Amino acid sequence: VTYLDVDENGVVKLDELKKAIRPDTILVSTMYVNNEVGAVEPVEEISRVIKAKNPSALYHVDAIQAYGKYVIRPKKQGIDLLSVSSHKIHGPKGVGFLYIRSGVKIKPLIYGGGQQAGMRSGTENVPGVAGFGAAVKEMYTDHAEKIQKLIGLKDYMTDRLGEIEGTVINSKKGEASAPQIVSVSFEGVRSEVLLHALEDKGIYVSSGSACSSNHPGISGTLKG
Protein backbone atom coordinates (compact mmCIF):
# COMPACT_ATOMS: atom_id res chain seq x y z
CA VAL A 1 0.00 0.00 0.00
CA THR A 2 1.30 3.45 -0.95
CA TYR A 3 0.14 6.47 1.07
CA LEU A 4 0.15 9.83 -0.69
CA ASP A 5 0.92 13.22 0.81
CA VAL A 6 -1.49 16.11 0.47
CA ASP A 7 -0.84 19.83 0.16
CA GLU A 8 -1.50 22.44 2.86
CA ASN A 9 -5.20 22.44 1.90
CA GLY A 10 -5.58 18.67 2.23
CA VAL A 11 -5.66 18.00 -1.52
CA VAL A 12 -3.82 15.06 -3.11
CA LYS A 13 -0.65 16.10 -4.92
CA LEU A 14 -1.17 15.00 -8.52
CA ASP A 15 2.55 14.79 -9.29
CA GLU A 16 3.07 12.40 -6.36
CA LEU A 17 0.06 10.36 -7.48
CA LYS A 18 1.53 10.05 -10.96
CA LYS A 19 4.87 8.86 -9.57
CA ALA A 20 3.20 6.36 -7.22
CA ILE A 21 1.17 4.53 -9.89
CA ARG A 22 2.97 1.39 -11.07
CA PRO A 23 2.14 -1.28 -13.67
CA ASP A 24 0.91 -3.53 -10.82
CA THR A 25 -1.31 -0.86 -9.22
CA ILE A 26 -4.85 -2.24 -9.05
CA LEU A 27 -6.70 0.43 -7.07
CA VAL A 28 -6.46 4.09 -6.12
CA SER A 29 -8.81 5.31 -3.38
CA THR A 30 -9.43 8.91 -2.32
CA MET A 31 -12.05 10.89 -0.48
CA TYR A 32 -14.24 13.25 -2.47
CA VAL A 33 -14.50 15.57 0.54
CA ASN A 34 -12.37 15.40 3.69
CA ASN A 35 -14.60 14.98 6.72
CA GLU A 36 -12.51 17.18 9.05
CA VAL A 37 -11.52 20.27 7.07
CA GLY A 38 -13.82 19.92 4.05
CA ALA A 39 -11.09 19.84 1.39
CA VAL A 40 -12.51 18.88 -2.01
CA GLU A 41 -10.43 16.53 -4.13
CA PRO A 42 -10.21 17.11 -7.92
CA VAL A 43 -11.65 13.69 -8.72
CA GLU A 44 -11.79 14.18 -12.49
CA GLU A 45 -8.13 15.22 -12.62
CA ILE A 46 -7.16 12.34 -10.35
CA SER A 47 -9.00 9.91 -12.62
CA ARG A 48 -7.24 11.27 -15.72
CA VAL A 49 -3.83 10.84 -14.06
CA ILE A 50 -4.66 7.26 -13.07
CA LYS A 51 -6.00 6.21 -16.47
CA ALA A 52 -3.12 7.86 -18.34
CA LYS A 53 -0.52 6.03 -16.25
CA ASN A 54 -2.30 2.69 -15.82
CA PRO A 55 -5.64 2.25 -17.64
CA SER A 56 -6.39 -1.02 -15.83
CA ALA A 57 -6.19 0.53 -12.34
CA LEU A 58 -9.56 1.20 -10.72
CA TYR A 59 -10.47 4.48 -9.03
CA HIS A 60 -12.58 4.32 -5.85
CA VAL A 61 -14.05 7.48 -4.34
CA ASP A 62 -15.33 7.76 -0.77
CA ALA A 63 -18.17 10.20 -1.39
CA ILE A 64 -19.79 9.97 2.03
CA GLN A 65 -19.26 13.67 2.80
CA ALA A 66 -19.89 14.78 -0.79
CA TYR A 67 -23.13 13.02 -1.70
CA GLY A 68 -26.09 15.34 -1.29
CA LYS A 69 -23.86 18.41 -1.41
CA TYR A 70 -22.63 17.93 -5.00
CA VAL A 71 -24.16 16.56 -8.17
CA ILE A 72 -21.96 13.53 -8.80
CA ARG A 73 -21.70 11.93 -12.26
CA PRO A 74 -19.45 8.87 -11.79
CA LYS A 75 -19.21 7.97 -15.48
CA LYS A 76 -18.45 11.53 -16.57
CA GLN A 77 -15.96 12.03 -13.73
CA GLY A 78 -14.11 8.78 -14.42
CA ILE A 79 -15.08 7.07 -11.16
CA ASP A 80 -15.12 3.26 -11.15
CA LEU A 81 -16.35 2.72 -7.58
CA LEU A 82 -18.22 5.15 -5.34
CA SER A 83 -19.33 4.60 -1.74
CA VAL A 84 -22.10 6.57 0.00
CA SER A 85 -23.69 6.42 3.47
CA SER A 86 -27.30 7.33 4.25
CA HIS A 87 -26.85 8.99 7.64
CA LYS A 88 -24.81 11.87 6.19
CA ILE A 89 -27.87 13.15 4.34
CA HIS A 90 -30.27 12.69 7.29
CA GLY A 91 -31.28 9.17 6.27
CA PRO A 92 -31.29 6.08 8.52
CA LYS A 93 -28.05 4.71 9.95
CA GLY A 94 -26.76 1.36 8.71
CA VAL A 95 -27.64 1.93 5.05
CA GLY A 96 -25.51 2.95 2.10
CA PHE A 97 -24.66 2.04 -1.45
CA LEU A 98 -21.67 1.17 -3.57
CA TYR A 99 -21.73 2.32 -7.19
CA ILE A 100 -19.89 -0.14 -9.43
CA ARG A 101 -19.15 0.94 -12.98
CA SER A 102 -20.42 -1.42 -15.64
CA GLY A 103 -17.73 -3.95 -16.48
CA VAL A 104 -15.96 -3.78 -13.10
CA LYS A 105 -15.89 -7.17 -11.40
CA ILE A 106 -16.20 -7.21 -7.61
CA LYS A 107 -16.22 -10.32 -5.42
CA PRO A 108 -18.93 -10.33 -2.73
CA LEU A 109 -17.93 -10.31 0.94
CA ILE A 110 -21.00 -12.28 2.01
CA TYR A 111 -22.30 -15.34 0.17
CA GLY A 112 -25.68 -17.00 0.53
CA GLY A 113 -29.06 -16.20 -0.96
CA GLY A 114 -27.80 -13.92 -3.69
CA GLN A 115 -29.59 -10.78 -2.60
CA GLN A 116 -28.48 -7.35 -3.82
CA ALA A 117 -27.43 -8.68 -7.22
CA GLY A 118 -25.33 -11.33 -5.50
CA MET A 119 -23.06 -8.71 -3.94
CA ARG A 120 -24.30 -8.98 -0.34
CA SER A 121 -26.46 -11.93 0.57
CA GLY A 122 -28.92 -11.71 3.45
CA THR A 123 -32.32 -10.16 4.01
CA GLU A 124 -32.41 -6.60 2.75
CA ASN A 125 -33.07 -3.74 5.15
CA VAL A 126 -36.19 -2.58 3.32
CA PRO A 127 -37.21 0.19 5.78
CA GLY A 128 -33.64 1.50 5.74
CA VAL A 129 -33.51 1.49 1.94
CA ALA A 130 -36.87 3.28 1.74
CA GLY A 131 -35.70 5.86 4.26
CA PHE A 132 -32.48 6.38 2.32
CA GLY A 133 -34.46 6.90 -0.88
CA ALA A 134 -36.69 9.47 0.82
CA ALA A 135 -33.63 11.32 2.14
CA VAL A 136 -32.06 11.42 -1.33
CA LYS A 137 -35.28 12.79 -2.84
CA GLU A 138 -35.50 15.48 -0.16
CA MET A 139 -31.82 16.40 -0.40
CA TYR A 140 -31.86 16.91 -4.17
CA THR A 141 -35.17 18.83 -4.23
CA ASP A 142 -34.32 22.54 -4.65
CA HIS A 143 -30.72 21.40 -4.31
CA ALA A 144 -29.02 24.53 -5.66
CA GLU A 145 -30.95 26.79 -3.28
CA LYS A 146 -30.08 24.60 -0.28
CA ILE A 147 -26.38 24.61 -1.13
CA GLN A 148 -26.32 28.38 -1.63
CA LYS A 149 -27.87 28.78 1.82
CA LEU A 150 -25.18 26.51 3.30
CA ILE A 151 -22.44 28.49 1.57
CA GLY A 152 -23.86 31.75 2.91
CA LEU A 153 -24.01 30.40 6.46
CA LYS A 154 -20.47 29.03 6.25
CA ASP A 155 -19.06 32.29 4.89
CA TYR A 156 -20.81 34.30 7.61
CA MET A 157 -19.62 31.93 10.33
CA THR A 158 -15.99 31.86 9.19
CA ASP A 159 -15.91 35.65 8.76
CA ARG A 160 -17.19 36.24 12.27
CA LEU A 161 -14.96 33.57 13.83
CA GLY A 162 -11.99 35.08 12.04
CA GLU A 163 -12.55 38.29 14.01
CA ILE A 164 -11.73 36.48 17.27
CA GLU A 165 -8.10 36.79 18.34
CA GLY A 166 -6.22 33.49 18.45
CA THR A 167 -8.59 31.78 16.02
CA VAL A 168 -7.36 29.69 13.10
CA ILE A 169 -9.84 28.73 10.38
CA ASN A 170 -8.71 25.35 9.03
CA SER A 171 -11.42 25.16 6.36
CA LYS A 172 -11.07 27.17 3.17
CA LYS A 173 -13.84 29.25 1.61
CA GLY A 174 -15.24 28.87 -1.89
CA GLU A 175 -15.10 25.83 -4.15
CA ALA A 176 -11.94 24.48 -2.48
CA SER A 177 -13.98 23.42 0.55
CA ALA A 178 -17.33 21.71 1.12
CA PRO A 179 -20.19 24.01 2.17
CA GLN A 180 -21.21 22.00 5.26
CA ILE A 181 -17.87 21.70 7.06
CA VAL A 182 -16.12 24.33 9.19
CA SER A 183 -12.97 23.43 11.13
CA VAL A 184 -11.70 25.97 13.65
CA SER A 185 -8.85 25.97 16.18
CA PHE A 186 -8.76 28.26 19.22
CA GLU A 187 -5.37 28.97 20.72
CA GLY A 188 -5.12 28.17 24.44
CA VAL A 189 -8.67 26.79 24.77
CA ARG A 190 -9.43 23.20 25.79
CA SER A 191 -11.93 21.70 23.37
CA GLU A 192 -13.94 19.98 26.12
CA VAL A 193 -14.49 23.28 27.97
CA LEU A 194 -15.59 25.01 24.77
CA LEU A 195 -17.94 22.15 23.84
CA HIS A 196 -19.78 22.40 27.17
CA ALA A 197 -19.92 26.20 27.05
CA LEU A 198 -21.49 26.11 23.58
CA GLU A 199 -23.83 23.28 24.56
CA ASP A 200 -25.27 25.48 27.33
CA LYS A 201 -26.26 27.94 24.60
CA GLY A 202 -27.82 25.27 22.38
CA ILE A 203 -24.88 25.13 19.97
CA TYR A 204 -23.54 21.67 19.21
CA VAL A 205 -20.09 21.04 17.77
CA SER A 206 -17.54 18.23 17.85
CA SER A 207 -13.91 18.26 18.91
CA GLY A 208 -12.87 15.75 16.27
CA SER A 209 -14.15 13.24 13.74
CA ALA A 210 -16.44 10.41 14.83
CA CYS A 211 -13.98 7.82 13.53
CA SER A 212 -11.27 9.08 15.91
CA SER A 213 -13.48 9.48 18.99
CA ASN A 214 -11.63 6.66 20.77
CA HIS A 215 -8.24 8.25 20.08
CA PRO A 216 -8.06 11.57 21.93
CA GLY A 217 -5.33 13.97 20.94
CA ILE A 218 -4.44 16.29 18.11
CA SER A 219 -6.07 15.37 14.81
CA GLY A 220 -3.70 13.65 12.39
CA THR A 221 -5.32 15.64 9.59
CA LEU A 222 -4.57 18.98 11.25
CA LYS A 223 -1.10 17.84 12.28
CA GLY A 224 -0.22 17.03 8.69
Regions found by a protein language model. Name each.
Residues 1-224:
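Pyridoxal 5′-phosphate
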